Every structure is written in structure tokens, then in C-alpha cells.
Amino acid sequence: MRRVGTCLVAVAIWGGVAWGAAEPAPLDWRKDTYESDPPRLANPLRDATLSVSGQWSDRGPQYVTDGEIVANNHWACEQLPAVLTVAMREKSAFSACRIWFYFGEPRIYKFFIEASPDNRSWTRIADWTKNDRPATAEGFVVAFGKEVEAQYLRVTITDSSVRGAGGHIVELMVSSAALTPGLHGRQAPTDRIDDANATGDESLKTWRAAAWRNERVHGQFVVWSAEAVPQLRLRATALRSEKGAEIPASAVVPRFVRYVRAGKKTAGDILDPAPSVDLPAGGFRPVWLTVTVPAKTRPGLYRGCLTVKGAAGKEVAFPLELEVLGAKLPDPEDWAFFLDLWQHPWAVARYHGVAPFSPEHYRLLEPIYRELANAGQKTLTTTIAELPWNHQNFDAYHTMIPHVKNADGSWSFDYALFDEYVAFGKRCGLGPQIHCYTMAPWGDRVYYIDGSTGDQISVALRPGTPEHEAYWGPFLKAFQRHLVKKGWADDTYIAMDERGPEDTRATADCVKKFAPRLKIAMPGNHPPSHFKGIALDNYCQFIAHVDDAFLKEVPQRRAEGKVTTFYVCCGPSRPNTFTFSPADEQVWLGLYAAANGLDGFLRWAFVNWPRDPLFDSGFGPWPAGDTFLLYPGPRSSVRWEMLRDGIEESEKIRVLRGRQAASPALDESLSAFHFKSAEKSTGAALSEQVRRARQAVEDAARTLR
């Protein structure tokens, strides 16, 4: 494990970095990625029950499947034949095994291997009874000739070159993949990689993609090895065209995919710029490649290479081919897609152990917020109430504007933190909208400071009551005056989250009465018909409630300067952005907005981190990854990159439509993007929808000049 910097995307520098082992830096749990279970190839023997014909001293069969290739850690049996029987938990298919006998000194073992479906009828699948090769640290790869399906495996050692010493097995591994020595690899789709799909055709090493200028495009690769390979390092070259044009190496960034807990399993989601990662015996490691195509890149075919290299000279090279099209994406600040991912500054402060809104806190927030701005984020999340979401976060949200009730009954409001934070967010590129949560907090409880005693007072105030109006009316008047002075009044929205129509209407009426220049924003989880007649300037609807009537209103709302988006949260189960969600689901969300004419997408949240997000992405009863998309570091994630990718696809479609280049094939592919069918679909079916839409976008882009 390595201490890494705070840059989101980093390049491992090839020159000047020595290959091989180095002293590890001390682990800092706030900065270093660590995995509860490093990814390993599927090995049916891992949880198997082992029995033996006998054992010497403490040299029992537990060593045979512990994943460690250590000569002195072996099962030993002095009496020949020495028999090891493996009972797997279920039937498995495999085509080869790799077996390590004791290799501390030159010894030759003769043996045969049998398989059985039921522990009664046995078939010999490998015969090495005439073996004359001594055992080595590389072990023997034993091919079975054809795929074998069995639940039981038996290894019988018939002879040893050291008389009287018996039989000794260090490790046994079976797999449907190649178990030959060395580092293996392949190019892979940009999807979740696990032990079931890690290995594959090693002849498929070349990554090929097409990209617009000013686009961020991705690829994925997987390397694996039967033996341990310490100090895997990554190097990507510049991409060059035959005419001498270049995409610099700084724009060609490989990162290791790290695994994090996602419920009862782990999922490869963290994109880690660590300088090196150790590959355990029988392990695999995905590598994620991101190419940011400069806006002024000349169209053409660009070539380069990604190399994954470990200690002892083991390496795999992956050729890279990127076709840069003539089409160009606007800069993110000019994207029309309305992205609203809520921020949580207190979570960042707690995780890093710094005082909220201290200079160090802002230093940590800046790369996070700039990355969000680089995806076209249109809102800054602020708070005007204590605990606007009650206690449903690991870290509480606090108010940025303390309310003080003076002894004479008047109110005072301190805008210092609010002003400082809004100015900071705008410098980072967030906005222009400022969303203020909330006049309708979950639980209806509001807080203020008693100016006479300094005590914090809390009281439940339901929207629509005289008491609610008496509390919020003075604030709204003063707040609007302050915002006018700052020049922010027209960009400020009083925001509510998933409140019913009665509370929403009452709150909107209160704002209109006391601060008519301010607007209303709300993500709603009730059918749109329930909110008829309520002036919602920014209206986000839960995807399951998006209906034809709602969609028909979008063009008119847009003409009136209003924003209409959709959101997902702890539901639906598909499509979504959970840690375990198939990667194409995040792309699907961006394409769904384009297909249905919606302005954009909202999600709770961007960095609402649980206690230890680099280790466990879950929080409370919600699905893993529900509360955040970016990891500490900051480190990107597969789901964040793919969500951003979907936003880019939506922007491409906007450009194509604006230039009358949207083809019938593109329109046809987008016609399939409906939630009701998607939630009942399979991951493979959604991936095919995404593939067809991407291809149609690419084909249409080729017509642009």
C-alpha cells in the first residue's frame, strides 16, 4: 500500500522510478487504499474441504489451498501412496490445474489426478506417473485435455526421488483459465471485473476507440498471474499520429482498479493512481485507462502503448489506438446538461480530521469541487437550516447561516460562512444556481440561538402554520436583501427534498410572500400531478414517476427559463449508480435524459462519505455507494467516470441535433430508453441499448465537417 497525492488523475512516471520492491510507506488510513479481500481468480478449491491419507507432524492439508507459494508450508505424508482428496462446495468446470510440490531441494514426484462428480465414480484426468522433472517454485501446469466438470478432485503421489520422504504438496490451484507461469493480460470492456470474467482471450490486447475532440474516453485491461507478482507499475506513452500530431502522455492516464466492500461482496470501483500494487498468487488486477483528448487535437488515428510491469521483469504490453473525430465537445462549463450532485463539506472535514471551513478544509475541497465542475455541475449545495435531512447521513449537515433570536424578539442572521462558502464554490466552477436547504427539513424541526442565554433552541414547525411563517418570514426578507447586495438573488433557490404537495405549496407560498425574487427547487417522489399549480422553478422528478404528461411540460418549462430533471436514489435497483451497478447503467442515465428531452440529472450525493469509504462503500440501510460517487484522495470511481461519460453522450446528441446531424438510426436507438422497461431488464440488455446508442452517435458524428 502506498501513500498517494491528492490529485484525481495522476501518471506513473516511468523514467527515474526503479522497478522492483521498495520499502512501503507507513499506512495512513485516511489516504491509502486498502482492500478487505484483494481480487483473486476463481478457484473452486478456495472453500473446499480437504482430506488426506495421512500427515507428518503439523504439516496438514490446510497449506494446499492457502494461496501462498512457500516451500516449507506444505502438506506432508511419509507413507506412499499419499492421497489428497478435495471436496468442492459445488460442481465446477476446469480445464487445467497448477500444482506445487516441495521445491526446497531438487525432488521428483510422480502422481496422477482423478475427478469425480459424486465421490464414488472416479476418472483419471491426468497421468504424471512417469514424470522426470524436479519440482520448482513455478510448479507444474497440468492440462486435462478437455474441460472437466466435477465436485471432487483427488491427487495421488505414487513415488518420490527421495526414498522414505513421502509426498509433499505446497499448493494446488484449478481454473478454466491458463495457469502457465508469467503475467497474463487482455483488453476488457469498461464493466465490472470479478473472478468470473477476469480472464479471457490473451490475443485481444489492443484497445481501440473513437473520440470527439475535448472528450474524456476510457478503456479497461486486466492482468492476472498464478504466482505472486510484486510491484505492478503502469506506464502509458503519448499517443501519436502518422503525421506527427500528439496527445501528450499527461493526457493518457492509467489507474489501478481497487476493490471496496459493497454489501456482502467486494466490487472493483476505486480508480487509484497509486504508483504500484502487489499482485498476489492467483490474483488479478483491472487497469483503467482515461484519455482526455485536447480540444485542439487534429483528427486522425493515434497510437501508443500501455505497459503493466512487475518485479523480475514480468510485463504485459497493450497497444492503444484512438481515432480522433472532427467533431468537438464544448467545454464542460458550456454544457447544457443540468447536473445536480449534492455536496457535503462536513463529511470531507471529518474524514480528513480538519476543522470545517478552515484553510486546510478548503484546500481539500477544491480538487473535489473542480472535478465536479469539470462535469458541468450547475448547482452549489448550501444549508440554511440545521440538520435539513435530519440524521440520515454519517456526518450531520449544519446550517451555514446561524439564526439568533434577540431579547427583544427580533432576529439576527450571520451570513459570513454562507458568503465565504458560496464564493469558494463559484471560484471552483460550481453554479450558477445556489440551492439552499431547507425551509422544510425532514422532521420539521428548526433550530435557533437564544441571544440572551446562548442556548440552542429547537422547535417543530410544520410548513403552512403561522409559527412556521413567523420563523421564516424575517429570515426570507433579510436573506433576499443580502443576496441582492451580493448579486446572487436571481441564482438562489429555496430547496426542498421529497416533501409532500401540502408542505411544498405552503413553503413556496411563504417564499413568494416574503422573498419574491428567490426561486423554488425540489426533487419530488410523488406523481407530478400532485404538484400541479405549484411554482417549481427547478423541478426534479424521481425516475419511476416520470410520465408522458410530465415530459410534455418540459419544452414549455424550458421556454419559461425553468429546469426539469430526474433523479435516482436508493431506488430503483436498476438503472442506478451503486458500487455494484453494471457500469453501462450510469451511461444509460445520461442517454435517458437526452432520449426523453429532460434537462439533466440529480443524485444524492457526490461526497457524502460513510465512516471509511475506501474500505466499505455502504452506509445504513441503503445500497452500497448510494451516498457518494467520488472517493477520498480524491480518487475517481468507475461509476463516476461512466456517469460523466453518459453526460458527454447527452451533450454529443445535443450538438448533433443542433447541427441537424441526428440520424434516423440515432433516433431509433434512443426510442428504447424507457424506465418501465429498463427496471425489468437485464444488465446485458441495458448494455446493448447503450452500445447501440453510442454507435449511432459515433456514426452521426462522422458526417460532421
Identify what each model region corresponds to.
Residues 7-16:
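Bacterial N-terminal signal peptides
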Residues 22-27, 33, 38, 58-126, ...:
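Aromatic, loop-rich ligand-recognition surfaces of beta-strand-rich domains
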Residues 72-77, 131, 144, 207-209, ...:
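Beta-strand-rich interaction surfaces with strong enrichment in secreted/lumenal proteins
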Residues 87, 98-100, 220-224, 292:
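Short edge beta-strand/loop segments characteristic of extracellular beta-sandwich folds
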Residues 181-203, 216, 223-289, 297-298:
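Surface-exposed binding patches on compact interaction domains or structured appendages
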Residues 291-292, 302-310, 316-517, 523-533, ...:
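Aromatic-lined carbohydrate-binding surfaces of glycoside hydrolases
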Residues 445-449, 456, 460-526, 598, ...:
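Catalytic domains of carbohydrate-active enzymes that cleave complex glycans
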Residues 538-619:
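Catalytic-core region of carbohydrate-active enzymes that cleave or remodel glycosidic bonds
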